Amino acid sequence: MLRYLSAGESHGKGLIAIIEGLPSNIPMDINRINADLGRRQQGFGRGNRMKIEKDRVEILSGVRDGKTLGTPLTLMIENLDYKNWTSIMSVEKLEKQNIIVEPRPGHGDLVGSLKYNHKDIRNVIERTSARDTAIRTAIGAVVKQFLSIFDIEILSHVISIGRAHYVPFVEDLFQYKSQIEASPVRCLNPTIEERMMGEIQRAKETGDSLGGVFEVIVRNVPIGIGSYAHFDRKLDGILAQGLMSLQAIKAVEIGNGIEGSSKMGSQFHDEIKYSEAKGYYHDTNRAGGIEAGVSNGEDILIRGYMKPIPTLMKPLKTVDMGTKEVKEAIIERSDNCAVPSAAVVAEGICAFAIAKEFLEKFRGDSIEEVEWNYERYMNYLRSR
């Protein structure tokens, strides 16, 4: 079974992940991992920490001679900012501490302090921080290299930021991937891009933050990934859980799910067609590539709805956890909009979910064994 564990604090020495369950002999290019880490750091609205960190991954185990070994693969990303936090983040007993007791509305400060009985909110901030998304991006970049063997491609773009909303005007966004990557907000439409950047700038000038919506598209996933047999094996449920675990994501949509809630069934469902060349297919994709928790061969479309970042330069009112007096929430260094960055992280999250279920179906200890199982299944589909 493909799984991972990650560890590390935002201002600690670094971030670590151990990935278990990858087959052996997958070609692994560290430059592709670092490229995704660089993409995560970009985007209009990012904070000053991106000027400090130059994220590069180190592979500590599980890869030799450019290929996976089939054993646990360990990744590490150094936090360059740690040198500025050595006294605060020391593992030894601190002689003097500046205790943080003013929780931010919308963040994990209050609930984390109460759940784990912390007197200092710093102990919560360090793990709830979106700095964790760096290692999740690296994990995603690893499994993307596995999926690419089977021509599975992943793309993300931003649909809205604040009041600036974009409706895609092309059918195949993969043809415009380079233009999306070149956009500071990952938006293909230059006019809407300017509006999005204007929204972010206005929020920054008033000490506020902004959320938005991004879409991830996964192409060439074969029919049959996921299962309707049990609730926890449904592919859309697995994808939704993955995205909901990403910091600040408050809603997830598969295909045209929200729009479909107000339509007749005859207007929403995708008619099934067949041809010798394509096999079974659909001309429309309102289901978002998943039916009954199982991939149907069309592009998988999933959207993440991101709330505004809770850290505000003009903070909201809160309660001092020591005195119970009304105070202003703490100000922690932060982005004021991270929707473009979240879209990149979401690619990796979706990649991991797809890879996990892909290996569940085509399991093997080596990539060659997985390919054999995959080819037999694809031949079976062609015979139907």
Swiss-Prot record:
One GO biological process term: chorismate biosynthetic process
Keyword line: Amino-acid biosynthesis, Aromatic amino acid biosynthesis, FAD, Flavoprotein, FMN, Lyase, NADP
Top-rank taxon: Bacteria
Reaction(s) this enzyme catalyzes, per UniProt: 5-O-(1-carboxyvinyl)-3-phosphoshikimate = chorismate + phosphate
Pathway as given in its UniProt record: Metabolic intermediate biosynthesis; chorismate biosynthesis; chorismate from D-erythrose 4-phosphate and phosphoenolpyruvate: step 7/7
PANTHER family in the cross-refs: CHORISMATE SYNTHASE (PTHR21085:SF0)
Listed name of the protein: Chorismate synthase
Organism listed in the record: Alkaliphilus oremlandii (strain OhILAs)
